[in-house]
A protein has these predicted regions:
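A cross-kingdom feature strongest in bacterial/archaeal respiratory oxidoreductases
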Residues: 2-99, 105-117, 121-258
Length: 258
């Protein structure tokens, strides 16, 4: 607040992506979002709003957007990334004289038009703004212990779905990169040894994971995994869980030999 010469900062908690989609907001500004990362019906619900899309390529969002504003790709602008150690790594534009404007420039122009200026006409000015704030040297929150979440009760033919995204998968930024996709991990379903015995399957046999929404059928791998759990990649070839099952994780699913 001091760095920006204001009395206080907003204290209200913002809306999550799901809350924004389900809200009565008439217009939304979206940049770098794949609706299939949110929910199976996200695209349908967003299509009912006035969507302004900041994009570098055609996507599911540009298909439903009322306005599409092309923005500069990383190679066309300067900027910075923060690595896993929290260190800022700056970079400069590799392609000079690009016709596309940076996303911060477009955001600043939109803010000016709606009467809420942020005064960040360039990436450099945004960088200066961030650096003026400096590092936090105030009180830090205490680490508190959290109780373990109880394991859901499941039947003999059921399991709790566990899932995450592989580094190389069906992510939208990997579209068209067939050679890169060829190095991705194969899609598998991971089950415990006891579940494999119950199902009567061996390594690489097909196993079907399903719910009332849909199903995924993949070769199985038997591993040291919690007996009540089954693992499936979240967004890989033949295993796009939001699209196929309508869920991503921690849901009860049926598991059977295919």
């Amino acid at each position: 607040a001091t760095a920006w010469s204001i009395d206080s900062l907003p204290s209200e908690i913002g809306m999550s992506s799901t809350e924004i989609i389900n809200s009565d907001l008439q217009a939304v500004l979206i940049g770098g979002v794949d609706p299939m990362d949110i929910s199976a019906d996200a695209k349908v619900k967003l299509a009912k709003k006035f969507v302004v899309s900041l994009e570098i390529r055609q996507s599911d969002i540009t298909d439903i957007a009322s306005v599409v504003l092309p923005v500069a790709a990383v190679v066309e602008k300067s900027g910075s990334f923060m690595d896993w150690q929290g260190k800022v790594r700056k970079f400069e534009a590799a392609v000079e004289q690009s016709l596309n404007r940076s996303d911060v420039r477009i955001l600043s122009m939109l803010a000016d038009e709606i009467g809420k200026p942020i005064n960040l006409p360039t990436v450099k000015s945004a960088r200066v703004e961030f650096e003026s704030v400096g590092s936090w040297d105030g009180a830090k929150p205490e680490m508190k212990s959290a109780a373990a979440i109880s394991i859901k009760s499941v039947g003999t033919d059921e399991a709790v779905l566990s899932s995450w995204r592989n580094l190389l998968d069906k992510g939208s930024l990997q579209d068209g990169e067939e050679n890169l996709a060829g190095t991705a991990r194969s899609s598998i379903v991971v089950i415990s040894k006891s579940r494999a015995n119950t199902l009567g399957v061996k390594e690489n046999d097909l196993v079907r994971v399903s719910n009332n929404y849909g199903a995924v059928t993949l070769p199985c791998v038997i591993a040291d995994i919690e007996e009540s759990t089954v693992w499936v990649p979240r967004n890989s070839v033949n295993s796009q869980l939001i699209r196929n099952l309508g869920v991503v994780s921690n849901s009860v699913v049926k598991v059977a030999k295919a």
